[in-house]
Amino acid sequence: MSQGQPRRPQQPAGQGENQEPIKYGDVFNVSGELANKPIAPQDAAMMQTAETQVLGQTQKGGTAAVMQAAATRNEQVGVVGHNDITDIAGEQGVTLAETDVAGRRIITEAVAGQVVGQYVQATPVMTSQVGVVLQNAITIGEALEATAKTAGDKPVDQSDAAAVQAAEVRATGSNVIIPGGLAATAQSAAAHNATLDRDEEKIKLNQVLTGATAKLPADKAVTRQDAEGVVSAELRNNPNVATHPGGVAASMAAAARLNENVNA
């Protein structure tokens, strides 16, 4: 199993010296209102329940464990109570979604709609009559299709379009943008969205990337170099110089890590 690891909260240097709460933004790549909220005990409890229901147990060093450690520390210094729940988490919920892509199970954890953790598991593989394990590497097209499910509701912006273009170039081996292809569609979507104010009216990633494999004229297994190229493109075109959790770059990076494990 591979996992996008959250940052484990640091213990204060001395007992009672640091009374500042550990906030979501301190340990997860989140933004907006959620980033400034302290992690509360009941938030962690909800994530533990979700992991147990879907994965059979909470994951060692995983999202629920990190949330529990942060919540325990916040309770110890008196900034939250044992039964407290963060208002935005209580209103919008904690979710754990499963997506099956090319024999892999992608598990995405979110708080208030923002991704805080992602796991990739290999599902049981087929074996041939002579007992050889057959396990195919994840392709660029499949990684893009995974993005349509893990971040499908995200409006397409210039960083997404740049990442999709970099992925298409890696898949086809050509720098020529294919008319009507994924990169061209993503660029058009980003340009269109830039003229709109309401997210509800904007073109979303799932509208561009669903069925990505069939839309690519060529495809290949994701390598670390492919992922690095896509990550670089997304970073360069994001004003905050950050990749989107569960987005194109994140899915490519997860696919590359899994492919390296398969080939190890």
UniProtKB/Swiss-Prot annotation:
InterPro entries: LEA_SMP, LEA_SMP_dom. The keyword Protein biosynthesis does not apply. Residues 1-16 have a biased composition (Low complexity). Keywords: Repeat. It comes from the Eukaryota. The keyword Repeat applies. Residues 1-23 are annotated as: Disordered. Residues 22-76, 138-194, 203-261 form the SMP domain. Pfam families: SMP. Coiled coil: none annotated. LEA proteins are late embryonic proteins abundant in higher plant seed embryos. There are two subsets of LEA proteins (5a and 5b), the first ones are expressed when the cotyledon weight reach 80 mg and the second set are expressed above 100 mg. The function of those proteins is not known. Belongs to the LEA type SMP family. This is a SET 5b protein. This is Late embryogenesis abundant protein D-34.
